[in-house]
Structures are given as structure tokens and as C-alpha cells.
């Protein structure tokens, strides 16, 4: 069975601002019937961990882009979800990209960290699981294939741009 790490900034039903979340949330079930095992990696925004219920840590970095981070594994709606828990980057009021005062000033750094974690998981594995393919969704995950290439990791990658307007 091929294993795919699907990396995105949002996924239904955990966090949604648009159609990206719908696709990322539906893809694992759609591909499971074709023999693919998928895990979704998203940031652990405020409230995401509570929706995952019981989780276990599968990866960690004591200094990911300026603070400690861990990836935890849980389930939501039958989908295995990995959440990047880095409070210094994601535990904020508002949505995934903006707060009460507008866009977060460090969005580029926040999503570069998500891509870094995805690439590290693809390179080293996480909790005994290592993907055969990394599927990056939109600009927020687009650096994952670049990090893998820079590190010389020979793993297939896919980058899907869901809406060119963003």
C-alpha cells in the first residue's frame, strides 16, 4: 500500500476558509479505495487539537523557526491527521491566515515551518511511518518539495495549486 503525506493549511472538518479544505478533507477517503494510505498534515491552530481527541506525539523539534514544535497523530472522521503543534506560530486568535488586525505578518515563516516539518517527516519518518509520496497543497505547503530536493531526498512530490487567485 502506497503511503501519501498530504500537506495543507486547512482540511475539513478541522479548519476551513475555502475549497482547499474540502479537497484536502475528502481526498484520503477517495484514495483509500484505490489502495492508498493517506495522512494529512495541518497546523495545530487554536482548537484543532481538541477536535482530534486522543493524540500521540510522533515527531518533534526543539527549535522550529524560533520555538518548540511537535507533530501529533490523531483521527478525525476516520482520517489520520498529523497536526503541527507550534504554539509560537499557530496558537492565535482569528483564522488560519489573519486575526482581528488583518493578515499575520509572519505567514511566510509560519507556512515555511509547516513545509519544513513535512519534509523532515518524509525524510526521517514519524512514529514508524514514512510516506512514499508528499502531496503539497497550495503556496502554504509549496516549500516541502523544495526542502526535500535541497536535502537530496529522492521521494516523489506533487504540488497542487487549487486557486491561482491566492
Predicted feature locations:
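Catalytic cores of nucleotide-sugar-dependent glycosyltransferases that transfer UDP/GDP/TDP-activated
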Residues: 1-166
Amino acid at each position: 500500500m502506497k503511503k501519501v503525506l498530504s500537506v495543507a493549511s486547512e482540511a475539513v472538518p478541522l479548519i476551513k476558509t475555502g475549497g482547499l479544505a474540502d479537497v484536502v478533507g475528502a481526498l484520503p477517503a477517495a484514495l483509500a479505495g484505490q489502495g492508498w494510505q493517506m495522512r494529512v498534515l495541518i497546523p495545530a491552530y487554536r482548537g484543532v487539537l481538541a477536535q482530534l481527541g486522543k493524540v500521540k506525539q510522533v515527531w518533534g523539534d526543539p527549535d522550529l523557526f524560533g520555538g518548540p514544535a511537535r507533530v501529533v497523530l490523531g483521527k478525525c472522521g476516520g482520517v489520520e491527521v498529523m497536526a503541527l503543534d507550534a504554539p509560537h506560530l499557530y496558537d492565535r486568535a482569528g483564522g488560519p491566515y489573519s486575526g482581528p488586525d488583518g493578515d499575520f505578518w509572519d505567514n511566510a515563516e509560519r507556512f515555511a515551518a509547516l513545509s519544513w516539518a513535512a519534509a523532515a517527516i518524509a525524510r526521517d519518518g514519524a512514529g514508524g511511518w514514512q510516506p512514499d509520496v508528499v502531496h503539497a497543497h497550495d503556496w502554504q505547503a509549496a516549500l516541502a518539495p523544495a526542502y526535500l530536493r535541497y536535502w537530496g531526498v529522492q521521494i516523489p512530490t506533487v504540488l497542487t495549486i487549487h486557486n491561482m487567485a491566492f
